[in-house]
Swiss-Prot record:
Top-level lineage group: Bacteria
Pathway per the UniProt entry: Protein modification; protein lipoylation via endogenous pathway; protein N(6)-(lipoyl)lysine from octanoyl-[acyl-carrier-protein]: step 1/2
Signal peptide: none
HAMAP family associated with the record: LipB
Gene Ontology BP annotations: protein modification process
Presence of the UniProt keyword Transferase in the record: yes
Annotated GO CC locations: cytoplasm
Annotated PANTHER family: LIPOYLTRANSFERASE 2, MITOCHONDRIAL-RELATED, OCTANOYLTRANSFERASE
Gene name linked to the record: lipB
Family designation: Belongs to the LipB family.
Protein name: Octanoyltransferase
Length: 255
């Protein structure tokens, strides 16, 4: 049974995720080259600790990874069917997923103590961020209560068929968020066949991307839409003032 959808034009109670009046804007950083997963996690955890201590601004870090799989806290080894790429065990919630070129990963480091300390509502806010981003390309993304992430209906594939276009996995440490979202812009979708994505084996539920849906969307297009939608839900952003050596030598502030 498919749950009632929530799409971009419906309203969620997300007002609590906007920052306090005296908060600094969220810094926005983009890495051009693929970032190795262990390096990204180490940098993310370092920045999150600085945010919790009040020594750094909140940060959204956009990047791509080289091809790899990650297993969250609910991951099952049986969901790795054909290990083609390295597998990394990680502290985020969720199960097994794929990351690689053509997929936009956004690591979101927000201080929820100063926003809204509610993990379920935070995940819903991330889903709504993705849904609003997809809406910029006239793609109707939907959320499901029993399937975290964002889905698109695929009647062309059969009745009740849906494909996942974006995944979510989060962790909180001292109420600062780690990890975040991954939107499929133009990844190699065949790489998902080596796993049971997010533990969902029902053949009605697959994986798609913006390009797979027939849209000529570039990563730069996706980044612009992500930033605009983020601002509506989480508040103002500002280009990172300089490359942060704790993040990545290949990172840049948006032009």
């Amino acid at each position: 049974m498919i749950n009632a959808p929530l799409h971009a034009r419906q309203t969620l109670d997300l007002a609590g995720f906007r920052p306090q009046a005296d908060a600094r804007p969220v810094e926005w950083l983009i890495s051009e080259a693929p970032v190795p997963y262990p390096d990204a996690v180490a940098a993310m955890e370092s920045r999150a600790a600085a945010i919790a201590a009040g020594d750094a601004a909140e940060l959204v870090w956009l990047l791509e990874h080289p091809p790899l799989y990650t297993s969250g806290t609910s991951g099952q080894s049986t969901d790795l069917l054909d290990p083609r790429f390295p597998l990394h065990t990680t502290g985020r919630g969720g199960q097994l997923t794929y990351h690689g070129p053509g997929q936009r990963v956004a690591y979101v480091m927000l201080d929820l103590k100063r926003r809204r300390p509610d993990v379920r509502a935070y995940v819903a806010a991330l889903e709504q961020w993705i849904i609003a981003t997809l809406d910029a390309f006239n793609v109707r993304g939907e959320r499901r209560e029993n399937r975290v992430g964002v889905w698109v209906a695929r009647p062309d594939k059969g009745a009740d068929h849906e494909d996942k276009i974006a995944a979510i996995g989060v962790r909180l440490k001292r109420w600062v968020s780690l990890h975040g979202i991954a939107i499929n812009v133009e990844p190699d979708l065949s790489h998902f066949t080596a796993i049971v994505p997010c533990g969902i084996s029902d053949p009605r539920y697959g994986v798609t991307s913006l390009v797979d849906l027939g849209l000529p969307v570039t990563m730069a297009d996706a980044d612009i839409a992500l930033r605009a939608a983020f601002t509506e839900i989480f508040g103002a952003t500002v280009d990172a003032p300089q490359v942060d050596p704790a993040v990545d030598a290949g990172a840049r502030s948006p032009a």
